[in-house]
Amino acid sequence: MMNALDIMKHPAAYVSGYENTPTEEQYRAKQLCWEYNRTAPNEQEKRRSILQTLLGTCSPMTGIEPDFHCDYGFNIHTHGLAVINYNCVILDTSPVNIGAGAFIAPGVCLACSGHAIDPE
């Protein structure tokens, strides 16, 4: 049986009961996003280092403008040139693959999770 972290990393859809949610991974991502969002514009090497630590796969050609927020980070994978503009939120409770040549506009939210809409 897979644990919650393995289920989240798997590309198949799942229903979460929020039991055993990897909170340490969430705290890690929040801390790294906080650090990233407080870097100076000229601290490109520091930004690169934080992204390499935060994201599951980070192409050297990935650029993300602050503010940036995500749930976990390990489920975000960039491939080739990927430009993510200001105020992006990625709710990566499942894998998110951002392909080469992707340009994401300001204020975009990519949400893998959803909430039940059927009251039953």
What are these regions (language model features)?
Residues 68-79, 83-120:
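Flexible, glycine/small-residue-enriched loop-and-beta-strand segment within the central core
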Residues 1-61:
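Terminal amphipathic alpha-helical/low-complexity segments used for targeting or macromolecular assembly
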